[in-house]
Amino acid sequence: YLAVGLIALHGLRLSELATLEVRDGNKLFVGSIKQNVQNQGKKIPPRRVFALDIKGKEGLGNELVAHYASGLYGLPEAIETQIKKVEEKRRFSDVGATLTQQLNRTTIWKQLTKKTKGLTPYSLRHRWAFIAHKASDSPISVRDAASSMGHTTTTHLSFYGSWTSEASIEAAVARHQ
């Protein structure tokens, strides 16, 4: 519950569970897990992530961060085991793979994937972007959403720009009339 909620409400990559840090009471930060040509050898500071709550469950994201920070609620043991091995293995991917394995074993996830074509654990992260841009009365700018999710606007648009349709453009324009 905690891992799934943190990912879905904060738009985390699955493997970012390994880098969670709570600062200043209830502000959630994640460290960099991406290794590519652009950031090779660079020290990338942790980025702050923000909850986009479920309607009717306002404050749930902050509640989950508080649970995590308290230490009373933890991530599943198998995920914690992989987090402890990150430095030794020099990779984060096993954290996400373990979460995927854990989800695939649950009855509710099996039911959801059977009912929802194309649903994957990464859909939890994609939910954040969808809420940010398409399911809110106050959409978040592409630049701000991309920054919160830890990628460039180009990357953000390449993944999430396909959600544009004539109907969505018409609705957006109508809101500004």
Predicted regions and their residues:
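Short amphipathic helical patch at the helix-1/turn junction of helix-turn-helix
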Residues: 7-9, 133-137
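Catalytic-site neighborhood detector that most strongly recognizes the C-terminal catalytic loop/helix
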Residues: 34-37, 149-174
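Conserved tyrosine-mediated DNA breakage-rejoining catalytic core shared by Y-recombinases
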Residues: 10, 19-63
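Short, polar N-cap/turn motifs at the start of nucleic acid-interacting alpha helices
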Residues: 23-29, 138-159
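Basic, Lys/Arg- and aromatic-enriched nucleic-acid-binding interface segment
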Residues: 1-14, 18
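Active-site-proximal segment of tyrosine recombinases
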Residues: 16-18, 119, 129, 137-150
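Active-site/catalytic core of tyrosine-dependent DNA strand-transfer enzymes
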Residues: 50-128, 133-135
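Recognition helices and adjacent regulatory flanks at domain boundaries
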Residues: 108, 121, 147, 172-175
